[in-house]
From Swiss-Prot:
Keywords: Amino-acid biosynthesis, Arginine biosynthesis, Cobalt, Cytoplasm, Hydrolase, Metal-binding, Zinc. The lineage of its organism: Bacteria, Pseudomonadati, Pseudomonadota, Gammaproteobacteria, Enterobacterales. Catalyzes the hydrolysis of the amide bond of N(2)-acetylated L-amino acids. Cleaves the acetyl group from N-acetyl-L-ornithine to form L-ornithine, an intermediate in L-arginine biosynthesis pathway, and a branchpoint in the synthesis of polyamines. Pathway: Amino-acid biosynthesis; L-arginine biosynthesis; L-ornithine from N(2)-acetyl-L-ornithine (linear): step 1/1. This is Acetylornithine deacetylase. It holds the Pfam family M20_dimer. Binds 2 Zn(2+) or Co(2+) ions per subunit. GO terms for biological process: L-arginine biosynthetic process. The gene is argE. Belongs to the peptidase M20A family. ArgE subfamily. The active site is at residues 82, 144. It comes from Shigella boydii serotype 4 (strain Sb227). Homodimer. It is found in: Cytoplasm. GO terms for molecular function: acetylornithine deacetylase activity; zinc ion binding.
């Protein structure tokens, strides 16, 4: 029942007070089970059917799908339940206590993006869900901040095919219809150590890596020449060499060298295509030094994403907001949800607050976000 639902600010406060940090380091990583239980209970109180889905390969992480209404199509509102870790020394407030000051709501996850669920729940007070002509789905995912395992697994396993979806990441209520992807790899070269006084008796991994880097930089130039998407501020795929390490002493032939690099592909470029281009670029080194060079993923890859600019979802949201859709360089779960239905990224708060100490969401977003959620539910589930 709606009267069992706490006030908006108390929902928000409870979400922020429930830690759900995602981290690759096991000591920092936390289950989101308590947060999922909170959300599940609230949506059940509103009459939703709730399914909780364990996410394989994670440390006790879960997705939640709340659904109401019958038939095909409908609207999916999605978001992630986890946050990044926090630097205790840089926060001036308790990250897990929602505090309001000077028109801002402070706390870990206020903008990115636990708050979106508080907005959805509050908006549902003013909607008679018994009169929906199409179903409404609420998806809460796990591990977005690390592997995006929750959204990946949900997209792979669900039979759900809504008419459209909105992911409530902090976009300052500016609709986003496309973003680049992200691929990160480790290039590892195994040489053969030896005394530096006799270089011919070893294989210097740093020298081989120097050769490999030359070919990788040629690939970077080729990507810039071949692929363009003018709507992006950087309108081509970027390739960055981010970290390198090799050797242990000046008088030893280097036996191992490791390079970490990333590529941010444009929408429409497939991961197989990019991996093929990288393998082709490194082929001369591999042929010359068989068995000495390997390429390994550092993190699961994220493809680029694009919602067709002429889709009804884009037209409706642009009309409701009086704003054109944008493209951005950061990544979200949209590529995975987009495999189910056309998807936009749109939510309250600024992306500039994501992953920052003293994270906050400005209270000026409260009223327009609530109104927008009501409007999109009316449009896609009542008509």
């Amino acid at each position: 029942m709606k009267n069992k639902l706490p006030p908006f600010i108390e929902i928000y406060r409870a979400l922020i007070a429930t830690p759900s940090i995602s981290a690759t380091e096991e000591a920092l990583d936390q289950s989101n089970a308590d947060l999922i239980t909170l959300l599940a209970d609230w949506f059940k109180d509103l009459g939703f059917n709730v399914e909780v889905q364990p996410v394989p390969g994670t440390r006790n992480k879960f997705n939640m799908l709340a659904s109401i209404g019958q038939g095909a199509g409908g609207l999916l509102l999605a978001g992630h339940t986890d946050t990044v870790p926090f630097d205790d020394g840089r926060w001036t407030r308790d990250p897990f206590t929602l505090t309001e000051h000077d028109g801002k709501l402070y706390g870990l996850g206020t903008a990115d993006m636990k708050g979106f669920f508080a907005f959805i729940l509050d908006a549902l007070r003013d909607i008679d869900v018994t009169k929906l002509k199409k179903p409404l789905y609420i998806l809460a995912t796990a591990d977005e901040e690390t592997s995006m395992a929750g959204a990946r697994y949900f997209a792979e396993t669900t039979a759900l095919r809504p008419d459209c979806a909105i992911i409530g990441e902090p976009t300052s209520l500016q609709p986003v219809r496309a973003h680049k992807g992200h691929i990160s790899n480790a290039i590892r070269i195994q040489g053969q150590s030896g005394h530096s006084s006799d270089p011919a008796r070893g294989v210097n991994a740093i020298e081989l890596m120097h050769d490999a880097i030359g070919h990788i930089l040629q690939l970077r130039d080729n990507l810039k020449e071949r692929y363009h998407y003018e709507a992006f501020t950087v309108p081509y795929p970027t390739l960055n060499l981010g970290h390198i390490h090799g050797g242990d002493a000046s008088n030893r032939i280097c036996a191992c060298c490791e390079l970490h690099m990333d590529i941010r592909p444009l929408p429409g470029m497939t991961l197989n295509e990019l991996n093929g281009l990288l393998n082709d670029a490194l082929a001369p080194v591999i042929e010359r030094w068989p068995g000495r060079l390997t390429v390994d993923e550092l993190h699961p890859p994220i493809p680029g994403y694009e919602c067709p600019p002429n889709h009804q979802l884009v037209e409706v949201v642009e009309k409701l907001l009086g704003a054109k859709t944008e493209v951005v360089n950061y990544c979200t779960e949209a590529p995975f949800i987009q495999t189910l239905c056309p998807t936009l990224v749109l939510g309250p708060g600024s992306i500039n607050q994501a992953h920052q100490p003293d994270e906050y969401l400005e209270t000026r977003f409260i009223k327009p976000t609530r109104e927008l959620i009501i409007q999109v539910i009316h449009h896609f589930c009542w008509h």
